């Protein structure tokens, strides 16, 4: 049962809801019937609350979406506020919804495709790793032909990688055209996620952060400001894709959403939660994918389909 709903700022949705003693008791009985049920009271009640939320929150979620005309864009985070067997429990939830944004022009973006040049060392390393026997058995002409073949393969790979980078950048350019306020906590969370991704990239490539800054000619403060701007730009692009999908009629049908949800992929949609939110995640992913294709010119206008 909904007790309160409001927004700390546009798009930052907070609510408090309750469940009665009967609902809690039914969930407790379900948990206790399982062989690995928690023995301690706190653990038992916590598991029962989680079961109740996952089983009953979906209807309340749909009610919120319809009554308050919000478009959630993140999974809700739950917080248990109070619980006892005599009264049930009281819990809070927070999620982010599409804030009041406007998108300007979202076609006509231009981004050069710039493959990284190939060094001779790269060719030699590739031959040593994958063509060693072939290279040792070849004569001079064969060795030269092998190097040309490997160079062509590496170049084709780098061209494909460069095209992928250019497509991503085209989509990120959309972020520059999306205007309006963003929830501060959503921006902050996106920045920290971008920072984690950057740190993992440095580690994977064996690059020292100080060396990285030296090559870029930036101070720590300048880099952080740049990374923050990049994170917000990507967030605006991510939200802007939903606006483009709506404007161009690219939303998937219910049947398409159901078909995609039936073959759930955690890498694409994250962990399953509850039915209404899971459908929302799949629907928005499909819409964003189509909007991305539309922006880079690979998806037809809705009127042409």
Predicted regions and their residues:
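FKBP-type peptidyl-prolyl cis-trans isomerases
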Residues: 1-305
């Amino acid at each position: 049962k909904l007790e309160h709903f409001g927004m700390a700022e546009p798009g930052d949705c907070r609510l408090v809801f309750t469940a009665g003693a009967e609902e809690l008791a039914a969930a407790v009985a379900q948990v206790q019937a399982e062989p690995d049920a928690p023995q301690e009271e706190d653990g038992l009640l916590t598991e029962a609350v989680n079961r109740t939320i996952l089983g009953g929150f979906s209807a309340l979620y749909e009610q919120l979406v319809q009554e308050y005309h919000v478009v959630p864009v993140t999974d809700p985070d739950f917080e248990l506020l109070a619980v006892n067997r005599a009264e049930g429990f009281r819990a809070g939830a927070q999620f982010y919804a599409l804030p009041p944004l406007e998108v300007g022009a979202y076609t006509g973006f231009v981004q050069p495709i710039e493959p990284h040049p190939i060094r001779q060392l790269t060719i030699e390393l590739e031959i040593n790793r994958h063509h060693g026997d072939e290279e040792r058995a070849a004569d001079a002409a064969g060795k030269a032909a092998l190097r040309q073949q490997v160079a062509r393969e590496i170049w084709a790979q780098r061209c494909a990688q460069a095209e992928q980078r250019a497509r991503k950048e085209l989509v990120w350019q959309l972020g520059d055209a999306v205007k309006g306020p963003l929830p501060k906590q959503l921006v902050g969370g996106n920045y920290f996620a971008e920072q984690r991704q950057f740190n993992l990239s440095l580690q994977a490539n064996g690059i020292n952060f100080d060396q990285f800054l030296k090559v870029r000619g930036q101070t720590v403060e300048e880099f952080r400001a740049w990374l923050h701007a990049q994170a917000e730009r990507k967030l605006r692009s991510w939200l802007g894709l939903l606006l483009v999908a709506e404007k161009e009629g690219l939303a998937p049908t219910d049947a398409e959403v159901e078909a995609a949800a039936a073959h759930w992929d955690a890498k694409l949609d994250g962990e399953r939660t509850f039915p209404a939110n899971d459908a929302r995640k799949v629907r928005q992913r499909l819409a964003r994918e189509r909007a991305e294709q539309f922006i880079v010119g690979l998806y037809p206008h809705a009127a042409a389909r």
